[in-house]
Swiss-Prot record:
Protein name per UniProt: 3-dehydroquinate synthase
Cofactor(s) needed for function: Co(2+); Zn(2+); NAD(+)
Function: Catalyzes the conversion of 3-deoxy-D-arabino-heptulosonate 7-phosphate (DAHP) to dehydroquinate (DHQ).
KW Metal-binding (keyword) present: yes
Length: 356
């Protein structure tokens, strides 16, 4: 089975790439966790599709499996839900050498990871992402969190998984909106780090949208390699890793202001990337031609490029609560050229100029 390794010294772990191979998961997971006692967390959308396949494979490998199914969507990513799951873990008899398996998209991965990070001060954790967004973003890098009503991912930890399993066959069950949400993050990697990935997406956009397996596998693996490289250089987001938040400053503000209901995460990031590029253009960091090229690709995918019914002053206030802002300064990830990004301090009035 194809895999790459995220290099974090003693916390290094593999990301496996497969197609319709859930039957092999039990034997793979067994290599990476300390005991056979495991707790699967999934949601009501994913449960009927993949739970039995995973459960069967784990039981063939003699795992003692317990599980919990939660409502799908961002509204489950709360302290209340985390507490409920932690109490279930205790009721099921999980010990310090037990493991948590996240079977689902980004929300499931985040809250399951948070449970694993906090239960008995941290237990083993396995990621099985079932959305394109989770496969290329939240399942890689060890950031786990829950939301507060006023902000996204405010309560969290860094807790690296023992392994990640990416099965591209699951993408065939996603609707187009979910595929596009993941594609937004993949485009982001090309913009901030490796412009050859951006060019590959430009040249193969229609095949990618048609879910051609070889094209999808290429951009997913490339995205994981890019994120893995950045994480290995800056695991705790002290400096470099912050560039992964490109598009997220305004994106998170839009999500919070709309109650996490109007836009899925990738859509908000797409809008955020457009505005981050407008800001870089206004500040003279990139030229018009480069801006138009990025805007055109995002538009061609069918992702949104603008928000509706929000006041720019409210967006700025939400941005001030962003984790990237420190000492009352607004920190923004901005482009400095093709495949180059950095965190820059930006004045409030500069942001207001580009917002509508």
């Amino acid at each position: 089975m194809d895999f790459i390794t995220i290099d974090l010294k003693e916390r290094s772990y593999p990301i496996y790439f497969a197609y319709d191979s859930f039957d092999k998961l039990g034997e793979i997971v067994k290599k990476h966790v300390r005991s056979s006692k495991t707790f699967i967390i999934t949601d009501f959308n994913v449960y009927p599709l993949y739970f039995e396949k995973l459960n069967e494979s784990l039981k063939k490998s003699r795992f003692d499996v317990s599980y919990e199914v939660i409502p799908a969507g961002e509204t489950s990513k709360t302290m209340e839900m985390a507490q409920r799951l932690l109490e279930k873990a205790y009721d099921y008899g999980l010990l310090r050498d037990s493991s948590v398996i996240a079977l689902g998209g980004g929300v499931v991965g985040d809250i399951a990871g948070f449970v694993a990070a906090t239960y008995m001060r941290g237990i083993d954790f396995v990621q099985i992402p079932t959305t394109l967004l989770a496969q290329v973003d939240s399942s890689v890098g060890g950031k786990v969190a829950v939301n507060l009503k006023k902000g996204k991912n405010i309560i969290g930890a860094f807790h690296q998984p023992k392994m990640v399993y990416i099965d591209t066959a699951v993408l065939n069950t996603l609707d187009k909106r979910e595929i596009l949400g993941g594609l937004a993050e993949i485009i982001k990697y090309g913009i901030i780090w490796d412009f050859s990935l951006f060019e590959y997406i430009e040249s193969n956009i229609y095949e990618i949208l048609d879910l051609e397996e070889d094209k999808l596998r290429h951009i997913i693996k490339k995205s994981c390699e890019i994120k893995g490289k950045i994480v290995s250089l800056d695991e705790k987001e002290e400096n470099l890793r912050s560039i992964l938040n490109f598009g997220h400053t305004i994106g998170h503000a839009i999500e919070a202001l709309t109650g996490y209901e109007r836009y899925i995460h990738g859509e908000a990031v797409a809008i955020g990337m457009v505005y981050a590029c407008k800001l870089a253009l206004n500040l003279g960091y990139i030229d018009e031609k480069y801006f138009e090229r990025i805007f055109s690709l995002i538009q061609r995918t069918g992702l949104p490029t603008d928000y509706e019914d929000l006041h720019k002053e409210d967006i700025v206030e939400a941005i001030k609560l962003d984790k990237k802002s420190r000492e009352a300064k607004i920190n923004f990830v901005l482009l400095r050229g093709l495949g180059k990004a950095e965190v820059t301090t930006v004045k409030e009035e500069e942001i207001l100029k580009v917002l509508k």
